[in-house]
Amino acid sequence: MDPVVKKPSPGGVQHRVTKGLRAIVGHACRHPIHTLLVTALTAATTHLHVLEGTYQAAHRGLAPWAKETPLNVQSFLCGSRTVTLGEASAWRWQIDDRPKVSEDGQSDFHWALVTLDLPGASVDASIPFLSNTLSEFLGAEQITPTPDSSPSPDHSALTFRVPYSQLDGFLQAVEIIPSEKEDDSWRLRSPREEGSPTSLGHWVGSSWLSFLHRVKHAETVDLVIIGLSYLAMNMTVVSLFRVMRQLGSRFWLATSVLLSGAFAFVLGLGITTTCDVPVDMLLLFEGIPYLVLTVGFEKPIQLTRAVLCVSEELRGGWQRPVPNGASSDDSRQSQLIPNIIQLAVDREGWYIVRSYLLEIGALALGAVLRPNDSLGHFCFLAAWTLLIDAILLFTFYATILCVKLEITRIRSPGGLGQVNAKHPSGIFGHKVKSTNITWWKLLTVGGFVLCHFLQLSPFFYRVMGEYMANGTLPPTAVSPFKEAANGLNEIYLTARVEGFETRVTVLPPLQYALESAGFNISATKRSTFDGVLDGLESPLGRLCLMGALVVSLVLNNHLIHAARWHAWPQARESAVPDGSSLSVPCSATAPEVCTRPPEETEALLKSNQAESLTDDELVELCLRGKIAGYSLEKTLERIAAGSSCSVTRLDAFTRAVRIRRAAVSKTPSTQNLCSGLAESLLPYRDYNYELVHGACCENVVGYLPLPLGVAGPMVIDGQALFIPMATTEGVLVASASRGCKAINAGGGATTMLKGDGMTRGPCLRFPSAQRAAEAQRWVESPLGHEVLAAAFNATSRFARLQTLTVAQAGIYLYIRFRTTTGDAMGMNMISKGVEKALEAMAAEGGFPDMHTVTLSGNFCSDKKSAAINWIGGRGKSVIAEATIPAETVRQVLKTDVDALVELNTAKNLVGSAMAGSLGGFNAHASNLVQAVFLATGQDPAQNVESSSCITTMKNIDGNLHIAVSMPSMEVGTIGGGTILEAQGAMLDLLGVRGAHATEPGANARRLARIVAAAVLAGELSTCAALAAGHLVNAHMQHNRSAGATVKK
């Protein structure tokens, strides 16, 4: 069933808007690479256009120091303030920027306070020149500068009191100031006049200095408010990443939202500057956080949620049978990713557009009401930015979602993310009604405009003079009582004593640039950027860029189509032909998109209502310790049992393995090493974990495929068999096969079973050595043996106690129980019998003071090479022999009988004795034992004692007689790894699977004989290779890469 989409009424505004959005989104998503490329190129071109406009102005020689025209005093007066002092103001300074002329037509005593801002740490060498020359020529007088009057700590300030009528001449005189170095000088940077262009470096430099100046003279509360606004904006960005992470994207979707917003701002700025609307950089700096907080990122999140919800619903519909009368192709067509995004636009497109229209309308109203104000200009820019952002949301960002879903479909066909329809979307994870969202945004935008209209904060909305024509920062109105306090104090004292009414104009600090021999440093810095632009504008640069563009377009377009070709065949393979139903587990395999809060998932788990928990939620519960990693199988088995869906026990166990892999990959303490486990090449699917659970392995994360070969056939006791061998060592199976061939030529191998009894040796402690000796005598007595055997044999119908071997060490007593175990290897069986026998010994033997230290005291001796096993045997004691004709030795084994006999004596017997070997009188019996053990599901660790072997060879009548004696072969055909399907199949290959129908233990004994025969074949072939000198060549051919050839 297709997802239900609430369609607008035909002919209405909503219907027409939705229809238009569908067409736009469909076209963009069907050509994703083209859409992304066009958007990026448009934004980049606009950015370069704005950037290049400011740069080329400087490149054409319009920098202030490049002009030859006289200085314009009025340009330096921009941002100045005039204060008056006289009887009218009760001899207090009063700001009065209006021109004032005395009755006789002469101006009152009018001074100008000029501060020279010189870059550099020392200006002492220039002070004599300035103070002497200027005072004689112009009557200018140097006064003490006000502390912190320079905007930068590495600048120095000089303050002069100049008659206002001589200000023009003063500025001409101080245009160039010599430095302490002969070749260096400071050159005055005159401010731009209205309509004149500026350079990028000058714009950035002046903006930075002005920013420092404003920060230094701003109120603390203003700085705190701005800091809090930027902190809140950053929190909004962090919240965007958090929500997108909950939706299944850790980085790219949130980054794409920010990139789309940046593109919208650049394009909006380009349109604003094209319309000759000045951009107040200070107000832009202050207003962007409020714009981000007001608009937020809810609309991209809303569209993302809708797309993922529709995708999940269609994914569920794909797995359901096609209804009667419906076309399967139509069902598949509805799941094309562009159609998925169109269905999402049908759901949420109108509401997103309506929200955009409300915000743009509010900003447009602000631009209309304040056309000549900085607030109006900012509203103009913000309105265009939002309009372009809306266009990019349904083109650029929709294309990003399309590519994201395509990639997800490639990685996991049919699993593009799940959405829980029972949990509606909200603002950053909180449930909020859509009407509340609209009213809240409207009120926020209205409050934002109202706050700017009332100009509540003097720092935010301070009038800063006339605007620069190209939208750079306007000059700042100085604060005379902060920047010229010392100069005003000196003038105040003089005026008060003489009694003259005085006017003082405080100019903004004059900025200087340090030059060396007429060479300006800033010009050098700009030349690098100039070279880049010139290189890009050259024919070769344009050709390279165009070629890279074409190649990128073709390759990316091909990759997108290849992704679609890759996804659809897999989807068609999973479809059910002829309308038949498909059984799908209710627990989805894809990660949850609309995730629930942790408290809700924990409550579902505790209340046994966890059937709706998704894989991601279960992984998070594991990482938080709410589900133990080892109990995932039990948890999911319980969930499956209580689920209404037909989830089998095997499905639950397989899901447990998948979740454990993800949990291990995301464990913080090991993530740097294990993060790739979930997607690694370690397989986990298509395995019967029901057989593994509770029997073979815990904390399962998959299974290891091991190469399996067969040696033979080999005639063993008159029956021909292929011997399965699982190994990663080359030559081993080939060598054993050669040994089988040689043995078959002599009539095959003959085996003998010399003993069958598994052992367990507990350790007992007594109060004294005397009591331990008494216990030993009791155990070795007929009564003790009878009591222990009766208790032991009662625990199993196969376990029958054979012998008891006792050893004492001080107060410790060791009893070695030896017993038959049927077709099982018998470790668990004998442990249970020993436990019951010891209880009978304490109760009936009169040893209540006996204490069982451990059930296994290493007197067994299990999984360790020991003389007691070599001499007394453990498990099955087997001998295998064969006679190989001399001709076969020469033809097949490529050696002779005497050479083999001598090698065996010198290597396997004398050599092992020289090494002090214990049970290691063989060439490589362990190789064959381990390979057969792995293939047939035996305990690999018991290869230690099972491979104890002595190989003997003798020349009898010119033929070779070979035998292997293995006193402690520990094998079984039931229990342990033999229950696994693959290992059981190999036991079937040998005809020994499970328990023998009529003779308990016959299958296990038969398997021991086969292992001994395999060892016999391996020993024969390897010793022959050593005698003939072929071992190294064989390994280089079968187990090594080819050696490097040497040039002649």
From Swiss-Prot:
Topology with respect to the bilayer: Multi-pass membrane protein
Annotated active site: 729 (charge relay system), 863 (charge relay system), 939 (charge relay system), 1035 (proton donor)
TM stretches of this protein: 33-53, 221-241, 251-271, 277-297, 349-369, 378-398, 440-460, 543-563
Functional pathway: Metabolic intermediate biosynthesis; (R)-mevalonate biosynthesis; (R)-mevalonate from acetyl-CoA: step 3/3
Residues in the Cytoplasmic compartment per record: 1-32, 242-250, 298-348, 399-439, 564-1048
GO BP term (any one): coenzyme A metabolic process
Residues engaged in binding CoA: 735-741, 892-894, 1034-1035
Residue stretches making up the SSD domain: 222-403
Catalyzed reactions per annotation: (R)-mevalonate + 2 NADP(+) + CoA = (3S)-3-hydroxy-3-methylglutaryl-CoA + 2 NADPH + 2 H(+)
Segments on the Lumenal side according to the record's topology features: 54-220, 272-276, 370-377, 461-542
One Gene Ontology term of the molecular function aspect: hydroxymethylglutaryl-CoA reductase (NADPH) activity
Cellular component GO terms held in the UniProt record: endoplasmic reticulum membrane; peroxisomal membrane
Localization of this protein: Endoplasmic reticulum membrane
Pfam families on file: HMG-CoA_red, HPIH, Sterol-sensing
Classification via InterPro entries: HMG-CoA_N_dom (IPR025583), HMG_CoA_Rdtase (IPR002202), HMG_CoA_Rdtase_cat_sf (IPR023074), HMG_CoA_Rdtase_CS (IPR023076), HMG_CoA_Rdtase_eu_arc (IPR004554), HMG_CoA_Rdtase_N (IPR023282), HMG_CoA_Rdtase_NAD(P)-bd_sf (IPR009023), HMG_CoA_Rdtase_sub-bd_dom_sf (IPR009029)
Sequence positions that bind NADP(+): 796-798, 823-831, 1039-1040
EC category name: oxidoreductase
Alphabetic keyword roster: Endoplasmic reticulum, Glycoprotein, Lipid biosynthesis, Lipid metabolism, Membrane, NADP, Oxidoreductase, Steroid biosynthesis, Steroid metabolism, Sterol biosynthesis, Sterol metabolism, Transmembrane, Transmembrane helix
Glycosylated sites: 372, 470, 520
Family in the record: Belongs to the HMG-CoA reductase family.
Function: HMG-CoA reductase; part of the first module of ergosterol biosynthesis pathway that includes the early steps of the pathway, conserved across all eukaryotes, and which results in the formation of mevalonate from acetyl-coenzyme A (acetyl-CoA). In this module, the cytosolic acetyl-CoA acetyltransferase catalyzes the formation of acetoacetyl-CoA. The hydroxymethylglutaryl-CoA synthase then condenses acetyl-CoA with acetoacetyl-CoA to form HMG-CoA. The rate-limiting step of the early module is the reduction to mevalonate by the 3-hydroxy-3-methylglutaryl-coenzyme A (HMG-CoA) reductase.
PANTHER family for this protein: 3-HYDROXY-3-METHYLGLUTARYL-COENZYME A REDUCTASE
Full protein name: 3-hydroxy-3-methylglutaryl-coenzyme A reductase
Species of provenance: Aspergillus terreus (strain NIH 2624 / FGSC A1156)
The organism's taxonomic lineage, starting at the top: Eukaryota, Fungi, Dikarya, Ascomycota, Pezizomycotina
